[in-house]
Regions:
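An alpha-helical appendage that flanks or caps ligand/catalytic pockets
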Residues: 12-46, 87-169
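Short, well-ordered, mixed-charge alpha-helical segments that flank or form enzyme active sites
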Residues: 2-5, 49, 66-68
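Acidic/polar active-site rim loop that often engages polyanionic ligands
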Residues: 2-13, 72-74
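Hydrophobic faces of well-ordered beta-strands that scaffold small-molecule active sites
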Residues: 1, 56-60, 75-80, 108-115
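Active-site mouth loops of central-metabolism enzymes
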Residues: 51-61, 116-119, 168-169
Length: 169
C-alpha cells in the first residue's frame, strides 16, 4: 500500500535491463536531494519523515562497467570483490580515473567489499567457509539459493573435481 506515486516509484522498472541503471541512479539522486525537475514523473514525491541530510549513495558493483557507471554518476563505489571476477585494483582505478564530480561527491570515494570467514581456529574457519563455497558455486551455475546452505549440507554435497577447481579460483 501507499500513495499511488510512491507505489509507482517503488515498482517502476521492476523488470528492467541494466541499461536503465543510469536513469534510476539519477532519479534516486534527484529524489533524495530534492532536485528533480518540476516536470519529472516523480516531482510530487517527497520523503517522509523529513530529515536534515540525505543518505550517501553508494553503488555496489562487481565489474568494470559498474565502476565506470559509479564514476560517471558521481556516486561513491563499493567493489564487490567477493562476487565478481573483475580485478579489484583495476576496477577502482577505472572508477578514480573516470570520476565526475557531482552533487553527491566532489571527489571519488571507494571501498572493497571482501568475504571474510572468522573462527577460533583455521580448521573451524575452513569448515564454516564450505557453506559460502557451495553458495557461490551454485550462483556461478545460475542457481540462486534462497540462503547460504548449512555447513552440513556443504560437507555432504557431491563435489566434482571441476567444482573444486572453480572453488579454488
Amino acid at each position: 500500500g501507499g500513495m499511488p506515486i510512491s507505489t509507482r516509484a517503488l515498482q517502476e522498472g521492476k523488470y528492467t535491463s541494466v541499461d536503465s541503471y543510469p536513469q534510476q541512479i539519477a532519479d534516486l539522486t534527484g529524489y533524495l536531494y530534492d532536485s528533480l525537475p518540476a516536470n519529472h514523473r516523480f516531482a510530487a514525491l517527497h520523503a517522509s519523515p523529513i530529515i536534515p541530510t540525505a543518505p550517501e549513495i553508494w553503488l555496489l558493483g562487481s565489474s568494470y562497467d559498474s565502476a565506470r557507471l559509479a564514476a560517471e554518476q558521481g556516486t561513491a563505489f563499493g567493489f564487490a570483490q567477493f562476487f565478481g571476477n573483475a580485478d579489484c585494483e583495476q576496477a577502482l582505478r577505472i572508477y578514480r580515473e573516470h570520476f565526475t564530480p557531482s552533487m553527491l561527491n566532489e571527489k571519488p570515494h571507494s571501498l572493497a567489499a571482501v568475504l571474510v570467514v572468522c573462527a577460533d581456529t583455521e580448521e573451524e574457519a575452513n569448515q564454516l567457509a564450505l557453506s559460502t563455497d557451495l553458495f557461490f558455486l551454485s550462483l556461478s551455475r545460475g542457481m540462486l539459493l534462497p540462503s547460504f546452505p548449512s555447513v552440513r549440507t556443504a560437507q555432504n554435497y557431491p563435489y566434482t573435481e571441476n567444482d573444486y577447481a572453480m572453488i579454488r579460483n
